[in-house]
Swiss-Prot record:
Belongs to the TRAFAC class TrmE-Era-EngA-EngB-Septin-like GTPase superfamily. Era GTPase family. This is GTPase Era. It comes from Borrelia hermsii (strain HS1 / DAH). Residues 200-276 form the KH type-2 domain. GO terms for biological process: ribosomal small subunit assembly. It is a peripheral membrane protein. Keywords: Cell inner membrane, Cell membrane, Cytoplasm, GTP-binding, Membrane, Nucleotide-binding, Ribosome biogenesis, RNA-binding, rRNA-binding. InterPro entries: AAA+_ATPase (IPR003593), G_ERA_dom (IPR030388), GTP-bd (IPR006073), GTPase_Era-like (IPR005662), KH_dom-like_a/b (IPR015946), KH_dom_type_2 (IPR004044), KH_sf_prok-type (IPR009019), P-loop_NTPase (IPR027417). The gene is era. GTP binds at residues 10-17, 57-61, 119-122. Gene3D superfamilies: 3.30.300.20, P-loop containing nucleotide triphosphate hydrolases. It is found in: Cytoplasm; Cell inner membrane. One of its GO terms (molecular function) is small ribosomal subunit rRNA binding.
């Protein structure tokens, strides 16, 4: 039986979280077209008769000197050092740039085995030729490259095979039925944040986080009271929406997802609160990003 830890890295919006969810068969990480939706190192667990793979989904790799981004990049570097294999995900629509060079430099210095995963092959207009030329110039062998569509689940079984081929014999780190090690509070908080980002799309920057005040199981029914924290006054109005329709829609969708995942009915109460410039508070950022 084989087992091991595998980090998933790449630029923002390349489909890292979709890949994690597709392999594990559950919604573990937030999926959004908004770059850098993933903040924490999210663990997903896949177990079959061959063994167990523990995936670590990481924030999108983006070069920036902002405090929040620096904290996210520290998470990426930390995840790489914890794993036996790296999945480097490239969006087939993106022409290789400075981030690709930097990521491959980091991988090379780590001395850790890696696979280049070219994602979204179901899309018509691509930069596949430019990507392959770039990888060839970097000395990446074709055996280390796999082309997939995480969303359409194309070549997902093949990527599992390649991962197992790179892992050593080892024990099961988690019980077979586990597909994540996230605590209920964190999962619930991330579901609410994910729905908020999805509903607002480009209207709201990344200046929000969610905070669970109460999460209780009351006679086999979840009672949840949570806050959506924003950094600016104008953002409160965007989330609440006209006549409270925005926050109502967020609550309804989040409630459905929470009920489905935890297989229990759910009472969810949301409130939007202002914490001015929280995204410039280094201590708070450190607490939010683990």
């Amino acid at each position: 039986m084989k087992s091991g830890f595998v980090s998933i890295i790449g630029r923002p919006s390349t489909g890292k979280s979709t890949l994690l969810n597709s392999i594990c068969g559950h919604q573990i990480s937030i999926i959004s077209s908004t770059p850098q939706t993933t903040r924490n190192k999210i663990k997903g667990i896949f177990t079959d008769k061959r063994g167990q793979i523990i995936f670590i989904d990481t924030p999108g790799f983006h070069l920036s000197k902002k405090k929040f981004n620096i904290a996210l990049m520290n998470n990426v570097h930390s995840a790489i050092t914890e794993t036996e294999l790296i999945l480097y995900v490239i969006d087939i629509q993106d022409e290789p740039g400075i981030e690709e060079n930097e990521i491959l430099t980091i991988i090379s210095k780590s001395k850790i085995n890696f696979l280049v995963v070219i994602n979204k092959i179901d899309i018509q207009k691509t930069k596949e030729r430019e990507i392959m030329i770039f990888l060839e110039k970097k000395g990446i062998k074709k055996d280390n490259i796999i082309k997939i569509s995480a969303e359409q689940k194309i070549n997902i079984e093949e990527i599992k095979d390649k991962i197992y081929a790179n892992l050593q014999e080892g024990p099961l780190y988690y019980p077979e039925e586990y597909y994540t090690d996230q605590e209920m509070n964190l999962r619930t908080s991330e579901i609410i944040r994910g729905v908020t980002i999805k509903k607002l799309k480009e209207e709201l920057p990344y200046s929000l986080y969610t905070q669970i005040e109460i999460l209780e199981d009351r006679k086999n029914k979840l009672f949840i009271k949570a806050n959506i924290i924003v950094a600016g006054e104008s953002q409160k109005g965007i989330i609440v929406g006209k006549g409270g329709q925005g926050i109502k829609a967020i609550g309804e969708e989040a409630r459905k997802i929470i009920s489905k995942i935890f297989e229990k009915k759910c009472d969810l109460f949301l409130q939007v609160k202002l914490r001015k410039n929280w995204n410039k508070n280094s201590k708070l950022i450190k607490n939010l990003i683990n």
